[in-house]
């Protein structure tokens, strides 16, 4: 009777991190619930299932939904938790499990509650949010064993099935959903039967947006399919992304360069200001009496009444920003010149997609063409190549014995879901022949450290600050997704067109098998970028990434110099332990160097998060260093 299967399903589990040094990762597992235990198996296609863990139901102290306030970094978005008592070590540990949909999660939680509600060791309070970065997100307590902050009711919804809907409720549930229209910002060509081709500026019905990176849409002829969400934007008169003059997250320095390169009187753009939700109009003019043309910046102000209205010059107030821009395209109205030529950088080139096609992460060898070797890294050689002879890609061939391949393959699909304009996109893996290959977005100018050294003496301080901003944007995204880089440095960032910098190789050091690189005593271990808690205890967190980011900023503002110059690893450890920090680079302002020093606080909790660093750097950039 105890072996009777109550539920079985493929779910995703988060590593339990029973040791402080254990990595935080997500793995697909096949879960089986019986009257006696909750077991999970490794389930690979064509292979026998392997038991990876089993929990006696009698030891479960709590089963509950996790009310998350963060982006879930795996493709199952419905988390629940079990708190388990381990009699052997007299300790508690959490098992976070992610279901594919709300119904699946509800089914597992209700069944587990029913089977455990009479356990002797149930808790009276639990934590409704995640334990993350050394604290509970729900109540900010800093001890993992801390008593919960919300009452736990083991019987709530456990044994009672919901009442059937009334006829009125039933009719309501079958009402047609309100139609949402989206607009394509780019063309998207595809031959995949699961997908739908897009034409720039055409409208589509949004059918399903539950997947972050791929939306299901329908065209005006009734054809349906998936398309990359980064190519689409919701249709709304106040959605600025539909307008050719809007540049979402461009820095002041890059905006000025674009407008100066245009060189046309009245060339303009609207961009995000440093305060979230506010905007700036930047316009090029030759009208001011001076030898050189210049860029003027106007903050778009808001009225205090409701609904808000917008203006640049107080005499001319409008109900929306598009109406304000439309007026000033025909009238100066207090501006140095009227807005004549819209300038937009981000619509010139379509963004990368999360995967080369919808649902595709395994790439066939016949689909890849190798062109030339362009570098080498910790895992092996890197080649420029093409996918299906048309999409330029970077292909990393993995040297035998360099990587824990099985562990990486388990997480590759999850890593592909990480997609951001300032991250180098992993497109997929090629597994069917040795050596295995990783297929990445191709970045034109190679790694940042080499680029800085090759162009030394040619950079303005504003340009270097823009590079740091790019990296910080990517790291703020990883921080929000609860992903630790573990090896952030200029060598692991890549340079693309228009000097856009993207973070690469995030989390990859978890799969390195070379002890000389992964052990803090190894000759290849990157001590010069490591925080004190990393080289002393191998304790990684987003705050250890912040320390590394401070060193990366130093690399950038010293135009590619090696930190701590000729000091050995042991000397660096000794210096840092006695309070020594890197000197201020010549091109770094006092404000910039102050941020570096904030990153190098000895205690991790004293270092700012990337979200705060991003705001501080943006403020410095807007103020002109």
Swiss-Prot record:
Cofactor detail note: Binds 1 zinc ion per subunit.
Catalytic activity annotation: L-tyrosyl-[protein] + ATP = O-phospho-L-tyrosyl-[protein] + ADP + H(+)
Keywords, in A-Z order: Adaptive immunity, ATP-binding, Cytoplasm, Immunity, Kinase, Metal-binding, Nucleotide-binding, Nucleus, Phosphoprotein, SH2 domain, SH3 domain, Transferase, Tyrosine-protein kinase, Ubl conjugation, Zinc, Zinc-finger
Induction field: Through a myriad of surface receptors including the TCR/CD3 signaling complex, coreceptors, or chemokine receptors.
Cellular-component GO terms for this entry: cell-cell junction; cytosol; nucleus
PTM comment, free text: Phosphorylated at Tyr-517 in the activation loop of the kinase domain by LCK. Subsequent autophosphorylation at Tyr-186 leads to the kinase activation. The autophosphorylated Tyr-186 lies within the substrate binding sequence of the SH3 domain. Ubiquitinated.
Known cofactor(s): Zn(2+)
Domain SH3: 177-237
Catalytic site positions: 487 (proton acceptor)
Annotated binding of ATP, by residue: 374-382, 396
Modified residues (Phosphoserine): 570
Binding sites annotated in the UniProt record for Zn(2+): 127, 138-139, 149
Residues the record lists as Phosphotyrosine modifications: 186, 517
Compartmental location: Cytoplasm; Nucleus
Gene deletion effect: Mice display decreased mature thymocytes and elicit profound defect in CD4+ and CD8+ T-cell development. Additionally, they show a strong decrease of cytokine production in response to TCR receptor stimulation. Impaired TCR-mediated calcium response in gamma-delta T-cells. Loss of Vgamma2-positive immature thymocyte-specific transcriptomic profile, although there is no change to overall transcription factor expression levels. Not required for the generation of IL17A expressing gamma-delta T-cells.
Every SH2 domain range: 245-343
EC code(s) of this entry: 2.7.10.2
Region (Disordered), start-end ranges: 153-174
TM region(s), chain numbering: none
Alphabetized GO MF terms: ATP binding; non-membrane spanning protein tyrosine kinase activity; zinc ion binding
Function, in words: Tyrosine kinase that plays an essential role in regulation of the adaptive immune response. Regulates the development, function and differentiation of conventional T-cells and nonconventional NKT-cells. When antigen presenting cells (APC) activate T-cell receptor (TCR), a series of phosphorylation lead to the recruitment of ITK to the cell membrane, in the vicinity of the stimulated TCR receptor, where it is phosphorylated by LCK. Phosphorylation leads to ITK autophosphorylation and full activation.
Domains: entry comment: The N-terminal PH domain allows ITK to be recruited to the plasma membrane by an activated PI3 kinase. This domain also contains a proline-rich region (PRR). The adjoining domain is a SH3 domain, which binds to PRR (from itself or from other proteins). Next, a SH2 domain is required for binding tyrosine-phosphorylated substrates. In the C-terminal region, the kinase domain is required for tyrosine phosphorylation.
Protein name: Tyrosine-protein kinase ITK/TSK
Organism per entry: Mus musculus
């Amino acid at each position: 009777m105890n072996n009777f299967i109550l539920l079985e399903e493929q779910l995703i589990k988060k590593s339990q991190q029973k040791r402080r040094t254990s990595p935080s990762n997500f793995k697909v597992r096949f879960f089986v619930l019986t009257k006696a235990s909750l077991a999970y198996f490794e389930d690979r296609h064509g292979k026998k299932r392997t038991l990876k863990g089993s929990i006696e139901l009698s030891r479960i102290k709590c089963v509950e939904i996790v009310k998350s306030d963060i982006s879930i970094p795996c493709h199952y978005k419905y988390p629940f938790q079990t708190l388990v008592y381990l009699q052997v070590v007299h300790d508690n540990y959490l098992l976070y499990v992610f279901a594919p949909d709300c119904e699946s999660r509800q089914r597992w939680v209700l069944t587990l509650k029913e089977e455990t509600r009479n356990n002797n060791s149930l808790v009276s309070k639990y934590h409704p949010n995640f334990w993350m970065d050394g604290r509970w997100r729900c109540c900010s307590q800093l001890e993992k064993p801390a008593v919960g902050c919300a009452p736990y009711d083991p019987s709530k919804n456990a044994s009672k099935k919901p009442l059937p809907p009334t006829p009125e409720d039933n009719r309501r549930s079958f009402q047609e959903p309100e139609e949402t229209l989206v607009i394509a910002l780019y063309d998207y060509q595809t031959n995949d039967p699961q997908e739908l081709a897009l034409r720039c500026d055409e409208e589509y019905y949004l059918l399903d947006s539950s997947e972050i990176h791929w939306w299901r849409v329908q065209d005006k002829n009734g054809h349906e399919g998936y398309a990359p969400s980064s190519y689409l934007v919701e249709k709304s008169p106040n959605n600025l992304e539909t307008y050719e003059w809007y540049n979402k997250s461009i820095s002041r320095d890059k905006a000025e360069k674009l407008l100066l390169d245009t060189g046309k009187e009245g060339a303009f753009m609207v961009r995000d200001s440093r305060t979230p939700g506010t905007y700036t109009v930047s316009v090029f003019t030759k009208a001011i009496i001076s030898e050189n043309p210049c860029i003027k910046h106007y903050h778009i102000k808001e009225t205090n009444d409701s609904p808000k209205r917008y203006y640049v010059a107080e005499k001319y107030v409008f109900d929306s920003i598009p109406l304000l821009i439309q007026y000033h395209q025909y009238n100066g109205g207090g501006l140095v010149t009227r807005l004549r030529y819209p300038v937009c950088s981000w619509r010139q080139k379509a963004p990368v997609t999360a995967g080369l096609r919808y649902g595709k992460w395994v790439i066939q060898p016949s689909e890849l063409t190798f062109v030339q070797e362009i570098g080498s890294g910790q895992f092996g050689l890197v080649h420029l190549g093409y996918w299906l002879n048309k999409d330029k890609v970077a292909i990393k061939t993995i040297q035998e014995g360099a990587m824990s391949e099985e562990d990486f393959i388990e997480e590759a699909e999850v890593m592909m879901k990480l997609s951001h304009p300032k991250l180098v996109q992993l497109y997929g893996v090629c597994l069917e022949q040795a050596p295995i290959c990783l297929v990445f977005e191709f970045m034109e100018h190679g790694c940042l450290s080499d680029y800085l050294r090759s162009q030394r003496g040619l950079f303005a301080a504003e340009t270097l600050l823009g590079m740091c901003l790019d990296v910080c944007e990517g790291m703020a995204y990883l921080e929000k997704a609860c992903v630790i880089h573990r090896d952030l440095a200029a060598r692991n960032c890549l340079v693309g067109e228009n000097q856009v910098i993207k973070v690469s190789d995030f989390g990859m050091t978890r799969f390195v098998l070379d002890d000389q690189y992964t052990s803090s005593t190894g000759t290849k271990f990157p001590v010069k970028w490591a925080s004190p808690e990393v080289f002393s205890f191998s304790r990684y967190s987003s705050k250890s990434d912040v320390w590394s980011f401070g060193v990366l900023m130093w690399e950038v503002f010293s135009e590619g110099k090696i930190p701590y110059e000729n000091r050995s690893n042991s000397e660096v450890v000794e210096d840092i332990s006695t309070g020594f920090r890197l000197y201020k680079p010549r091109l770094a302002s006092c404000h910039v160097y102050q941020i570096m020093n904030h990153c190098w606080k000895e205690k991790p909790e004293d270092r700012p998060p990337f979200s705060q660093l991003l705001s501080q750097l943006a403020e410095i950039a807007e103020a002109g260093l």
